[in-house]
C-alpha cells in the first residue's frame, strides 16, 4: 500500500478506544504511513489522560460529542437523560460537526479511521465526504449475524445495534474487534479481527504479587470497592479511575491505593496482580486475558453494551461477572484458576497482520 495520510476520530469515554487508536498509530507508522491529526470526542466531565498527549505524535483536537449521562453518584447510566442531553446539546454538536468539516478540509487526509465516535457517522450522513472512512471497534461484532446476544432485552438490543450502525454510517469497512474468530459475515463490510492491543503488552513478563488491580470507567464505583475493602483491610487494592471530580488521588489507607489513569503504570501493575476487577469494557479485559489474569467484570448499571461484554468475555474464558463489586468472588476464583489462554494469545498475536491486511484490501 502506498503511503497514506490518516486522520483519527476517537470516542474518548474510558481508555479502550484511545488505547486502540494508539496501537493503530504504531502499526501504521511502522508501515511508513502518516497520522496527521487525532480528534477525541468527549463530554465535559471527562479529561483526556496525560499519557494520550505523550503517545500520539501528531496534533490532538478535542470535540464535544454525545456521551452517556450518569446518575448523581457517577455510577449507572441514565438512558432517558442521555437522550434528552443529546437533544438539548444539538447546537453544540452541530458546532462540533462544523469543526470536523473544517479540519478535514484543512488536513485533507487520504483515510479517516473512526474509533466509535458517533459524530463521524452523523458527518457522513449530512456531508458528501469523499474521504474513505473505516471504523474500528468491538461493538461492530453486534452486526455479525452469528453473535449471541443475552436472552431478552430486545429494546436494548435494538438501540445498541442502531447506535452502532450510526457510528459506522458511510464506512467502506467496519473492523469488528473480537475475543475470538468467527465465520465471515454475510455483510461484506463487517470483518472480524483480533484485539488491537498496545505493543508494550507483548514485551512485559507476567508474575503474581499479593494485590488486586481495579479499573473503573465511572469513578463513582470507587465507594463500592472501598466498602468491600473496609471489610477486608488485609487485601491490597490498586485502583485506577478518571481523576476528574475525584476528591483524592493517592493512598486511601495502607492497603488501598488510588491512581489517575496512566497506561504504563496500569500495565505494569496488571502484569503483577492476582486478578483484575473492572467495569465490563473490552480493552482491559483483553490485556488481562493475554497476561493470563482472571477478571471480575461488573457492567455499569444501565449499560447494555457492558452487559453483553461481560457475558461474551465470560464465554471466551476471561473470568467471571457480577452485578456488583463483590471482590470476594474474584479472590476465591483466582485462588483456584488454572485457565490456559494460549489460543487467545495466538489470536491476539495475529492482530497486526490481520488488521493491516484488511486496511490494504480497501485502500490499495
Residue ranges and their predicted role:
Residues 196-272:
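Donor-nucleotide binding loops and adjacent catalytic segments primarily
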Residues 127, 131-192:
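Active-site-proximal region of nucleotide-activated glycan assembly enzymes
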Residues 112-115, 268-308:
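A donor-sugar binding/catalytic signature common to diverse glycosyltransferases
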Residues 10-22:
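A short, glycine/small-residue-rich beta-strand->loop->alpha-helix junction that serves as a flexible
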Residues 3-4, 12, 30-31, 35-88:
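Conserved nucleotide-sugar phosphate-binding/catalytic loop shared by glycosyltransferases and other
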Amino acid at each position: 500500500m502506498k503511503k497514506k495520510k490518516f486522520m483519527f476520530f476517537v470516542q474518548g469515554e474510558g481508555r479502550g478506544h484511545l488505547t486502540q487508536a494508539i496501537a493503530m498509530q504504531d502499526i501504521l507508522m511502522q508501515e511508513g504511513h502518516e497520522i496527521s491529526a487525532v480528534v477525541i470526542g468527549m463530554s465535559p466531565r471527562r479529561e483526556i489522560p496525560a499519557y494520550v498527549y505523550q503517545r500520539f505524535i501528531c496534533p490532538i483536537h478535542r470535540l464535544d460529542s454525545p456521551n452517556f449521562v450518569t446518575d448523581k453518584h457517577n455510577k449507572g447510566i441514565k438512558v432517558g437523560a442521555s437522550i434528552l442531553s443529546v437533544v438539548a446539546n444539538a447546537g453544540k454538536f452541530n458546532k462540533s460537526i462544523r469543526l470536523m468539516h473544517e479540519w478535514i478540509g484543512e488536513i485533507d487526509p487520504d483515510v479517516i479511521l473512526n474509533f466509535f465516535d458517533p459524530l463521524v457517522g452523523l458527518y457522513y450522513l449530512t456531508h458528501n465526504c469523499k474521504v474513505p472512512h473505516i471504523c474500528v471497534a468491538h461493538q461492530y461484532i453486534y452486526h455479525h449475524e452469528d453473535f449471541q446476544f443475552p436472552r431478552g432485552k430486545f429494546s436494548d438490543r435494538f438501540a445498541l445495534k442502531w447506535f452502532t450502525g450510526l457510528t459506522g454510517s458511510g464506512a467502506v469497512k467496519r473492523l469488528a474487534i473480537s475475543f475470538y474468530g468467527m465465520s465471515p459475515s454475510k455483510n461484506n463490510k463487517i470483518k472480524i479481527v483480533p484485539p488491537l492491543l498496545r505493543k508494550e503488552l507483548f514485551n512485559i513478563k507476567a508474575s503474581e504479587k499479593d494485590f488486586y488491580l481495579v479499573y473503573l470507567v465511572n469513578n463513582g464505583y470507587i465507594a463500592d470497592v472501598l466498602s468491600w475493602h473496609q471489610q477486608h483491610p488485609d487485601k491490597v487494592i490498586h485502583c485506577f479511575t478518571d481523576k476528574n471530580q475525584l476528591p483524592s488521588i493517592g493512598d486511601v489507607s495502607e492497603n488501598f491505593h488510588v491512581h489517575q489513569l496512566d497506561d504504563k503504570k496500569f500495565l505494569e501493575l496488571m502484569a503483577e496482580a492476582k486478578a483484575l476487577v473492572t467495569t465490563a469494557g473490552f480493552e482491559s479485559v483483553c490485556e488481562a486475558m493475554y497476561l493470563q489474569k482472571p477478571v471480575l467484570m461488573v457492567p455499569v448499571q444501565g449499560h447494555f453494551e457492558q452487559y453483553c461484554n461481560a457475558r461474551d468475555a465470560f464465554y471466551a474464558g476471561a473470568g467471571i461477572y457480577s452485578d456488583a463489586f463483590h471482590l470476594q468472588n474474584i479472590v476465591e476464583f483466582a485462588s483456584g484458576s488454572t485457565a490456559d489462554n494460549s489460543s487467545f494469545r495466538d489470536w491476539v498475536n495475529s492482530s497486526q497482520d490481520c488488521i493491516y491486511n484488511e486496511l490494504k484490501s480497501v485502500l490499495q
